UniProtKB/Swiss-Prot annotation:
Function: Plays a key role in amino acid metabolism. Important for metabolite exchange between mitochondria and cytosol.
EC number: 2.6.1.1
Catalytic reactions of this protein: L-aspartate + 2-oxoglutarate = oxaloacetate + L-glutamate
Subcellular location field: Mitochondrion matrix
Protein name, as recorded: Aspartate aminotransferase, mitochondrial
Gene name for this UniProt entry: AAT1
Residue(s) carrying N6-(pyridoxal phosphate)lysine: K286
Additional detail: In eukaryotes there are cytoplasmic, mitochondrial and chloroplastic isozymes.
């Protein structure tokens, strides 16, 4: 009898389909997927120029001297070294104080202190820049808008982050055209969209992502005059700027100088009527080498007009800022509960120690000088006629403008790995591979882009 029942039960198995079978296969990540593929290749000439991680002249991922010294201090400090408890939802108080001082007093000395003194900044420690963007996206989709403008081209993960956090309409504005920044096309697109929005009586202000410096992937940044024109337009159209500052310091070698866009956005004298806030997404992955520690921050800065121009100096925080604080905490709690501790301790030690901070500034400048050297080495070796903007590009990358087919040929025939959009990570170039790399690029550049 039992055997009969078991036999009958087994008859159902071929007809039962798990609900998990509906799950489709996602495509490999456009950057990290290539890096994984690279590891399986056996060719001795292979070069990985995909991931934006700084490497030294021997191809090794290094620890900044300032970070190494901070780590030793943490190891020698028993209380810091052994503390494995949870951080608060929004991160450690020390991290908040040190990072806000760096961002809004040192990087923005003219206007930042005004916002700090009037408690107009809500701050959250996040899982690097990606986490900052994700928290910002969730907050914006819940309360402000589900429309966003992303540069074309842009970091591949931008679209993914905002799609996954509730954004319904993702538009692309023209950033790059014929080797230059397409300022006119960019502004015209935004104005046309704003006009159509007005005609449709859509009152939700669209968001817009702005790369603070070292635009990824092109490496081309607007001039100060162009930035003023862009911010004038964004504030006039009541858009919500999301400033992605992943590469502070890597444009000029000066951490403070590279915060120009943030200083411009916060200029209360120039923009007294801006109303929809600024979302600053910042990371210490690139400029402190803390890639795996996932340490960054989100700052939501609000103007006086957002609180009907009212400010009570007797209040610790105005009611609007308290509302924003509470919602950010709720989002973080539901997303990852609290941030990791070790990376923030490293940042705290570096930012709070005068000598270590000075060493950090030197570390960043040294890194940028090496990237400049690599850029110049390649510039001298390559004989391309369209290298005009090569020297104008900044940061960790060179944008080759290769077609997807050329990138594929470079990968399959020469074992040189670029991202699919033709972005090349300069820190992967060194004395041992620069000749082979340039020969490979030269050969592929002569091929028909549409071949």
């Amino acid at each position: 009898m039992l055997r009969t029942r078991l036999t009958n039960c087994s008859l159902w198995r071929p007809y039962y389909t798990s609900s998990l079978s509906r799950v489709p296969r996602a495509p490999p990540d456009k950057v990290l997927g290539l890096s994984e593929h690279f590891k399986k290749v056996k060719n001795v000439n292979k070069i990985d120029l995909t991931v934006g991680i700084y490497k030294d002249g021997w191809g090794k991922v290094t620890t900044f001297p300032s970070v190494a010294k901070a780590q030793k201090l943490i190891e020698s400090h028993l209380e810091l070294n052994k503390n494995l408890s949870y951080l608060p939802i929004t991160g450690s108080k020390e991290f908040q104080e040190n990072v806000m001082k760096f961002l809004f007093k040192e990087s923005c000395p003219q206007f930042g202190p005004f916002y700090l003194a009037h408690d107009r900044i809500s701050f959250v420690q996040t899982l690097s820049g990606t986490g900052a963007l994700a928290v910002a996206a969730k907050f914006l989709a819940l309360f402000i808008s589900r429309d966003i403008w992303i540069p074309d081209p842009s970091w591949a993960n931008h679209k993914n982050i905002f799609q996954n956090n509730g954004f319904e309409n993702i538009y692309r504005y023209s950033y790059y055209k014929d080797g230059q920044i397409d300022i006119d096309g960019w502004i015209e697109q935004l104005k046309t969209f704003a006009y159509n929005n007005q005609q449709e009586n859509n009152k939700n202000p669209p968001c817009i992502i702005l790369h603070a410096c070292c635009h990824n992937p092109t490496g081309l940044d607007p001039t100060k005059e162009q930035w003023e024109k862009i911010i004038d337009t964004i504030y006039e159209l009541k858009m919500v700027p999301i400033v992605d500052m992943a590469y502070q310091g890597l444009e000029s070698g000066n951490l403070l100088k590279d915060a120009y866009l943030l200083r411009l956005c916060l200029n209360v004298n120039k923009y007294p009527n801006w109303s929809n806030g600024i979302f600053l997404c910042q990371s210490f992955a690139k400029n402190m080498g803390l890639y795996g520690e996932r340490v960054g921050s989100l700052s939501v800065i609000t103007p006086a007009t957002a609180n009907n121009g009212k400010f009570n100096p007797l209040q610790q925080k105005n009611s609007l800022q308290q509302n924003i604080d509470s919602q950010l905490k709720k989002i973080v709690r539901g997303m990852y509960s609290s941030p990791p501790g070790y990376g923030s301790r490293v940042v705290n030690v570096v930012l709070s120690d005068f000598k270590l901070k000075q060493q950090w500034f030197k570390d960043v400048d040294f890194m940028v000088q090496r990237l400049h050297h690599v850029r110049q080495e390649m510039f001298d070796r390559l004989g391309w006629p369209d290298l005009v903007n090569f020297a104008q590009q900044h940061g960790m990358f060179y944008y080759t403008r290769f077609s997807p087919k050329q990138v594929e040929i470079l990968r399959n025939n020469y074992f040189v790995y670029l991202t699919g959009d033709g972005r090349l990570s300069l820190s992967g170039v060194n004395d041992s591979n620069v000749d082979y790399l340039c020969e490979s690029l030269e050969a592929v550049s002569k091929m028909d882009k549409l071949a």
